Regions:
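Short polar catalytic/cofactor-binding loops
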Residues: 14-19
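Beta-strand-turn-beta hairpins that frame and shape the catalytic cleft
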Residues: 2-10, 145-154, 177
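Short, acidic/polar
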Residues: 23-32, 162-168
Length: 272
């Protein structure tokens, strides 16, 4: 943990998750421990940290073992004394699909929030690359803003990033930090990743912590990487350019509040 009460250290974990649940959990735990040893206060994992490029049976098996995922995150949050935003992991849905769910834990290991991804990636990136998340993921219907360490986090996942109204809603609910665990494709990442993340930071005067998946997953899908930590002015404080790893940034916990007072654009909107 950082020494000053005015300072916090954010950490974003970049992973190359596979279709093997236990390997991914071991990898995530190692990165959280690495971040904790470096003094991190808030650690954010990427989307699909526990399972990536899985078959239907593998997804269902992982969802049925979600208690193992939750137990690991709770234990390492308590052991390391860090807040964990748990990227996303599959949980069982009532209709036989799974949810793409982010679980949030405080320093004591208590689960303080659950967010199910609302916007599902049903797109054709190219003639050769298309996705239909709604065929196996049930969408959530409730945004989540959760307060811990005296700060409010707005929890989002990947494709949510393209819907600015969600971030404005979370900002109006008090969020000063947006977490955006992601698994962007390489083409969309090259074209839009940095632009979208900086825009969400600037237009809401909020921190953005955006951990990402990177590389080729189980010989199938390829993801962009480039995990980022961005300040409320849109400046990139840290970026992970390579493979799996951890980035950290020390920040002034009151910076977003100070900037919102000095540059009160959020109070100037005309359309409701």
């Amino acid at each position: 943990m950082s020494d000053s009460n005015q300072k916090l250290i954010f950490a974003a974990v970049q992973m190359n998750s596979t279709a093997v649940l236990q390997e991914n959990l071991d990898c995530a735990r190692g990165f959280i421990e690495q971040a904790g040893a470096a003094g991190a206060d808030i650690v954010v994992l990427p989307e699909n940290f526990s399972l990536m490029s899985a078959t239907g049976p593998q997804r269902r098996d992982a969802a049925e073992r979600s208690d193992e995922v939750e137990a690991m995150l709770s234990r390492v949050a308590r052991d390391q004394g860090v807040v964990i935003v748990g990227g996303s992991t599959p949980l069982p849905a009532a209709d036989g699909r799974v949810t793409n769910t982010c679980l949030v834990f405080d320093r004591s290991g208590e689960r303080i929030g659950r967010y199910d991804k609302m916007h599902l990636f049903d797109v054709s990136v190219s003639a050769e690359e298309s996705y239909q998340e709604s065929s196996y993921i049930a969408p959530g219907n409730s945004p989540l803003a959760v307060t811990t360490e005296g700060l409010t986090l707005g929890i989002t996942i990947c494709y949510d990033l393209r819907f600015p109204e969600l971030y404005r809603y979370l900002g109006e609910a008090g969020a000063e930090i947006f977490t955006v665990p992601s698994a962007f494709t390489v083409p969309t990442g090259r074209a839009h990743w940095h632009t979208l993340l900086r825009a969400r930071a600037v237009e809401n005067l909020a921190w953005v912590i955006a951990p990402a998946q990177v590389g080729t997953h189980s010989g199938k899908r390829k993801t962009f990487g480039h995990s980022l930590i961005i300040d409320p002015w849109g400046d990139i404080l840290a970026e992970h350019m390579g493979g799996p790893g951890v980035i950290l940034a020390e920040v002034d916990r009151d910076r977003a509040r100070k900037m919102r007072r000095q540059f009160p654009a959020l109070q100037h909107k005309v359309l409701k």
